[in-house]
A protein has these predicted regions:
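Acidic (Asp/Glu-rich) sequence patches and key acidic residues
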Residues: 4-206, 214, 228
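C-terminal or internal capping secondary-structure element at the end of a domain, subdomain, or sheet
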Residues: 218-228
């Protein structure tokens, strides 16, 4: 709809946990595809009637003799052949309209053998090594950006101390996570991942504690660059 088109477009990293015996990467991402290109699988779509646009015809009857003429000329909307109504087929659970493995977050993962990759089995990821690298980068960033706009561009908040900034930037996490059961997990307004009905369960837990620590270490973590 109109509001959807006006939303700010952005890229964000998603961690997809893939079970080699379960759904493939494409199958895990499919339920969250936006229908902007008209190629989203039909099973995930719902028809959204253009109610507001139809009601607006009342204010334009002097210029358009029929509703059909108004909808097609003013909005460029034709009647849907399947429903016989004016509207759009949309995915109510849409989270992305384009994706690429790695992308802007290429080689985000570090293996215990020392090489970087876009995907690794959990058992092969060097979590401590990634923490130390991120910590070093955070210290260098803080020390080289004492003042000015570059603080904001590097994720330094107004009320940050050096310690709080380093702690936050050293933690590995992605914007969202898709678990092998196909569920999409993203942070709520409290900054917590929505994997529990009790927000206190996750208040002090890290990405690692929530998604990695107790997971099957044979799972493959794939870093995906998504756009919406």
């Amino acid at each position: 709809n109109i509001e959807r088109k006006l939303e700010i477009k952005m890229h964000f990293p998603v961690g997809v946990l893939v079970d080699k015996k379960g759904k493939k990467l494409e199958e895990l991402l499919a339920p969250y595809q936006e229908n902007t290109m008209g190629n989203c699988p039909k099973e995930f779509l719902e028809f959204m009637e253009a109610t507001e646009e139809i009601n607006e015809y009342e204010d334009h009857k002097e210029d358009y003799e029929t509703l059909d003429e108004f909808m097609e000329d003013y909005y460029g909307i034709e009647k849907d052949k399947e429903t016989g109504k004016y509207g759009y087929w949309e995915n109510p659970n849409a989270q992305w309209d384009w994706y690429q493995i790695g992308g802007r977050w290429s080689n985000m993962l570090l293996s215990k053998n020392g090489y970087k990759s876009n995907y690794l089995q959990l058992k092969d990821i060097d979590w401590n090594g990634m923490y130390e690298i991120s910590k070093k980068q955070a210290i260098e960033t803080w020390d080289s950006n004492e003042n000015g706009i570059y603080r904001m561009l590097n994720g330094i908040k107004k009320d940050d101390t050096k310690e709080s900034y380093i702690e936050r930037m050293s933690k590995f996490e992605t914007y969202a996570v898709i678990t092998p059961d196909g569920k999409w997990h993203s942070k709520d307004k409290m900054g917590l991942f929505s994997v529990s009905t009790n927000e206190d369960d996750n208040r002090n837990k890290s990405f690692y504690d929530i998604f990695i620590k107790d997971a099957d270490q044979e799972l493959i973590l794939v870093i995906v660059d998504c756009h919406i």
